[in-house]
């Protein structure tokens, strides 16, 4: 399902507002179209409803702004996702058994690590998708182990750096088009050119952006060195543990017939995903705060002159 989300972002990102100002964008950090005092006086339930309506409205506006071809692609992906969910529910037992058997068989093959690494390297280049699927597959095969983490982390770092280098050196014009697809990334490009930019890049890497998209888009920002991009990716390698954990729990669910054990595994998957989501959004807002601080510092430096 994560891959379908990545595909939506890749297809939907081609349309963007003509106004490139970060804080005036319809897809910005601050909800400027909501009245602050009205939201402040709402209960937490009313705030959830308000945010839901706002996101639904923004989604409809973005969909209406797409061309017919892109609308058809989004609809196709939505229908495909519904079909996959239906098949998963109906054929759950057979699917789980097949996953367990396949993972056990692949674990015994000497070439499996090499194949996984090559596939992850391949999907590191935009607009290819499949990183989330391959990461979960690594967890299914090797579980929460050092070997699984090493395979996933190493191939992720190498693939990211390789994709970044190719887009920076050979496909820079295409990388610039990628960065213009997302107003947030385009706006923060001015604060990603320092010697310590790897911290900001690491925060971007942990934010909810498609894996391959980030590799190519950041290459379109002038002043970012391959060294800093590589350091940022190394810093974020612990995130691979979440994929391995979820993959291992999925395999455990297929290996047992106990309802209570399956329930525990399912709850642990939900908790792991919840932890990842909370951590991601916490870092997202930390990133927003840091961006505003750097913008303020730059503005103050200009005011001096």
UniProtKB/Swiss-Prot annotation:
Alphabetical list of Pfam families matching this protein: VTT_dom
InterPro entries documented for this protein: Golgi_membrane_TVP38/TMEM64, VTT_dom
Keywords: Glycoprotein, Golgi apparatus, Membrane, Transmembrane, Transmembrane helix
Topology versus the membrane: Multi-pass membrane protein
Entry keyword Transmembrane helix: yes
Lumenal side: 1-69, 135-147, 249-262
Main location (coarse class): Golgi
Subcellular location, record wording: Golgi apparatus membrane
Transmembrane segments: 70-90, 114-134, 148-168, 228-248, 263-283
Residue ranges that the UniProt entry lists as topological domain Cytoplasmic: 91-113, 169-227, 284-305
Residues modified by glycosylation: 41
Domain notes: The VTT domain was previously called the SNARE-assoc domain. As there is no evidence that this domain associates with SNARE proteins, it was renamed as VMP1, TMEM41, and TVP38 (VTT) domain.
Biological role stated in the UniProt entry: Golgi membrane protein involved in vesicular trafficking and spindle migration.
Family: Belongs to the TVP38/TMEM64 family.
PANTHER family for the chain: GOLGI APPARATUS MEMBRANE PROTEIN TVP38, GOLGI APPARATUS MEMBRANE PROTEIN TVP38-RELATED
Protein name per the record: Golgi apparatus membrane protein TVP38
Organism encoding this protein: Kluyveromyces lactis (strain ATCC 8585 / CBS 2359 / DSM 70799 / NBRC 1267 / NRRL Y-1140 / WM37)
């Amino acid at each position: 399902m994560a891959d379908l989300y990545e595909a939506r972002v890749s297809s939907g990102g081609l349309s963007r507002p003509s106004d490139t100002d970060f804080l005036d964008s319809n897809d910005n950090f601050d909800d400027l179209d909501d009245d602050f005092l009205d939201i402040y006086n709402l209960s937490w339930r009313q705030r959830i409803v308000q945010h839901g309506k706002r996101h639904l409205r923004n989604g409809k506006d973005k969909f209406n702004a797409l061309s017919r071809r892109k609308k058809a692609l989004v609809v196709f992906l939505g229908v495909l996702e519904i079909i996959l969910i239906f098949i998963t529910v109906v054929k759950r037992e057979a699917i789980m058994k097949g996953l367990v058997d396949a993972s056990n068989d692949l674990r015994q093959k000497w070439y499996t690590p090499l194949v996984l690494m090559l596939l992850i390297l391949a999907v590191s280049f935009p607009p290819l998708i499949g990183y989330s699927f391959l990461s979960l597959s690594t967890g299914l095969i090797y579980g929460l182990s050092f070997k699984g983490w090493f395979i996933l982390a190493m191939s992720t770092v190498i693939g990211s750096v390789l994709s970044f280098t190719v887009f920076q050196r050979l496909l820079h014009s295409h990388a610039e088009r990628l960065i213009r697809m997302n107003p947030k990334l385009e706006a923060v490009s001015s604060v990603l050119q320092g010697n310590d930019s790897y911290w900001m890049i690491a925060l971007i890497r942990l934010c909810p952006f498609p894996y391959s998209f980030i590799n190519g888009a950041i290459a379109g920002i002038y002043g970012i060195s391959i060294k800093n991009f590589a350091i940022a990716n190394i810093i974020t390698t612990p995130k691979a543990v979440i994929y391995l954990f979820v993959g291992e729990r999925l395999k455990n669910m297929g290996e047992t017939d106990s309802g209570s054990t399956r329930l525990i595994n399912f709850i642990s998957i939900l908790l792991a995903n919840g932890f990842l989501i909370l951590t991601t959004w916490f870092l997202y807002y930390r990133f927003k705060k840091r961006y505003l601080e750097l913008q303020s510092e730059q503005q103050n430096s200009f005011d001096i002159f």
